[in-house]
Regions:
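P-loop NTPase signaling cores
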Residues: 1-168
Length: 168
C-alpha cells in the first residue's frame, strides 16, 4: 500500500520544508534483527556513514525534539518468541524519552494488535486506476523513451499475472 514510499516522501518533504528537523528512517525489521536498542541502532547507522561523534549529536538532537522518527514495517518483525512485543516496548520507551520528536510508525492492518499510546491511527487508501496512471506518469516523466517504458509498465501491470504487484 506504499507505506515505505510514504515515509520516504515525508522525510524528503521534511528536509525540503523544515531544515531544523532531521528525518531518521528506522527499518523495524533491521532493528529487530540487529538486537540493538533503538538509540544504539540509530547511532550505528550514523557511524556506518562515518558521522563524527554520532552518540552525542543524536542525544542532543533527540532531546531538543529536532528529529522526525520514521519507524517502518512493524508487521515485518517476527512474532515468534515475543520479538514484536519486545520491539514495541522498546520503541514506546524510546519515543516516550524523546517525546518532543515527531514520529510515524507504519504497519499492515494484519498486525494491528499493537497499539501505541499517544499516536493517531490512520489507514492509507489504495490507489484507484486514475491515481495509478497519474503516479506512473509522474514516475516516468521524461522523453519519448520514458513514455514507452511507462506504457509498457502500465500494460504489464494490467496483466492477470501481475495481481500481486497491483496490490502493492
Amino acid at each position: 500500500a506504499g507505506k515505505t514510499t510514504f515515509l520516504k516522501h515525508v522525510a524528503l518533504r521534511g528536509v525540503s520544508s523544515d531544515l531544523s528537523r532531521v528525518p531518521i528512517f528506522i527499518g523495524l525489521k533491521q532493528l529487530s534483527d540487529s538486537g540493538l536498542s533503538v538509540f544504539d541502532f540509530i547511532v550505528n547507522e550514523f557511524d556506518v556513514c562515518n558521522f563524527p561523534d554520532a552518540t552525542a549529536y543524536l542525544d542532543q538532537l533527540l532531546k531538543a525534539g529536532r528529529a522526525i522518527l520514521l519507524f517502518d514495517g512493524l508487521d515485518e518483525v517476527n512474532v515468534a518468541d515475543d520479538e514484536r512485543r519486545r520491539l514495541t516496548a522498546d520503541v514506546e520507551n524510546f519515543t516516550r524519552k524523546y517525546n518532543d520528536c515527531q514520529r510515524l510508525i507504519t504497519c499492515r492492518l494484519a498486525a494491528d494488535d499493537y497499539h501505541f499510546q499517544g499516536y493517531t491511527y490512520v489507514e492509507m487508501a489504495d490507489f484507484d486506476q486514475v491515481q495509478i496512471r497519474e503516479f506512473v506518469g509522474k514516475w516516468f516523466d521524461g522523453d519519448t523513451k520514458q513514455r514507452e517504458r511507462q506504457d509498457l509498465f502500465l500494460s504489464e501491470l494490467n496483466m492477470a499475472e501481475s495481481e500481486g504487484l497491483r496490490e502493492l
